[in-house]
UniProtKB/Swiss-Prot annotation:
This is Probable DNA-directed RNA polymerase II subunit RPB11. The gene is rpb-11. It comes from Caenorhabditis elegans. InterPro entries: RBP11, RBP11-like, RBP11-like_dimer, RNA_pol_Rpb11_13-16kDa_CS, Rpo11-like. SUPFAM superfamilies: RBP11-like subunits of RNA polymerase (SSF55257). DNA-dependent RNA polymerase catalyzes the transcription of DNA into RNA using the four ribonucleoside triphosphates as substrates. Component of RNA polymerase II which synthesizes mRNA precursors and many functional non-coding RNAs. Pol II is the central component of the basal RNA polymerase II transcription machinery. It is composed of mobile elements that move relative to each other. RPB11 is part of the core element with the central large cleft. It is found in: Nucleus.
Length: 122
């Protein structure tokens, strides 16, 4: 079979995880290559970046289904850099995911407690 081995989709051998390339076609833009990632991270970052008023453009693509990397293109205003916008987006995403985790844990705890009460375990 011509497909790469399954472990190649997540195991980062001697390669870097992250590359930055200045985009010379448009002002104040950069292309970030993130290795061993897919649409899950790409779409979350794109949506979070587009919430920032300093970001003029944010988009990503997976060059080929058998290549496990995403290319994230960011263009910002002159007030910030693409790297700063990405850092802010990642920080905001971590906060949102922490809040989601807390809410899920609270809901599970509430369900298990109500289930225990219905069964007469308390």
């Amino acid at each position: 079979m011509n497909a790469p081995a399954a472990f190649e989709s997540f195991l980062l051998l001697d390669d870097k995880k992250f590359y930055i390339e200045k985009d010379t076609k448009v002002p104040n833009a950069a292309i970030f290559t993130i290795m061993k990632e897919d649409h899950t991270l790409g779409n979350m970052l794109k949506i979070q970046l587009l919430k920032d008023p300093e970001v003029l453009f944010a988009g990503y693509k997976n060059p080929h289904p058998l290549e496990h990397k995403i290319l994230l293109r960011i263009q910002t205003t002159n007030n910030t850099t693409p790297a700063d916008a990405l850092t802010t987006a990642i920080t905001d995403l971590v906060g949102e995911l922490s809040l989601l985790e807390h809410r899920i844990d609270a809901a599970i705890k509430k369900c298990t407690q109500s289930g225990d009460q219905e069964r007469g375990y308390n």
